[in-house]
Amino acid sequence: SKDEGEKPFWISFADLMTALMTLFLVVMAVSLMVVTKKINEATQAEKERSSEILDICMSIKDDPTLKNQLITVDCKENRINFGEAGRFGHNDYRLNAEGIKALSALVPVVLEAANSENGKKWFKQIVIEGFTDTDGSYLYNLNLSLRRSEWVMCSLLDPTFNPELTLTDEQKNQIKQLFLAGGVSFNAAKDSKEASRRVELRMQFYGLKEKESAEAQPIFVSAPIEKCQLAR
């Protein structure tokens, strides 16, 4: 009939817009779900990372070997403090016998933690930080703090510094890769000058995707006998 012939064949513009809006909302909802899922996965991964790093630090802190030492392990800041044992005399970069003894007890514990399942996954390096008081110029204190850090490294690798610390060649190579000597001058002074003249160890850990893009660690060949270059 005439009426049937005049019925519109195409859908109305309003119906078309409604369909497009519905499709747009569906696409947006799916996209939002995907983004939310990725955020939740990243959040969960970061929680797991933080938990595993805490386990690494606590394994060092709770090790019975360190029970009678003056060492303080701060698992919130990931720092290791030697207290009185890690202090230096004025204008002196030589770690005292008590500090070397504490270091001897600590290093095998740290290496064991670094070689654990979580340690291999997250442990990046340990920065040996030497500090000074505020006496003298900046460059003077920078040099002094560097020598204090280097003295700690000498205590780990030069057998004449610390006969009590017996390490295998593999452990010595791991120390060269894991430990980093760095000076900090007087940027973090304590309440007293005596407390400021100290050495601390700062543990650093990989980020979630950092290790995947990290460059390969250099391979160090152990010398028959490592010899410290600092004057004793």
Give a label for each model feature.
Residues 60, 64, 88, 92-127, ...:
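Periplasmic peptidoglycan-binding/anchoring modules of Gram-negative envelope and division proteins
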Residues 68-81, 122-124:
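Short edge beta-strands and adjacent turn/loop segments
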Residues 1-65:
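Short terminal targeting/anchoring segments
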Residues 93, 97, 127-210:
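Periplasmic OmpA-like peptidoglycan-binding domain that tethers envelope proteins to the cell wall
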Residues 50, 57-58, 77-80, 101:
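Charged linear interaction tracts used for macromolecular binding and regulation
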Residues 50-54, 103-108, 149-154:
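Well-ordered, non-membrane alpha-helical segments in soluble/globular domains
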Residues 78-92:
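Acidic/histidine-rich, surface-exposed loop or edge segments in extracytoplasmic proteins
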Residues 213-232:
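Short, cationic low-complexity segments
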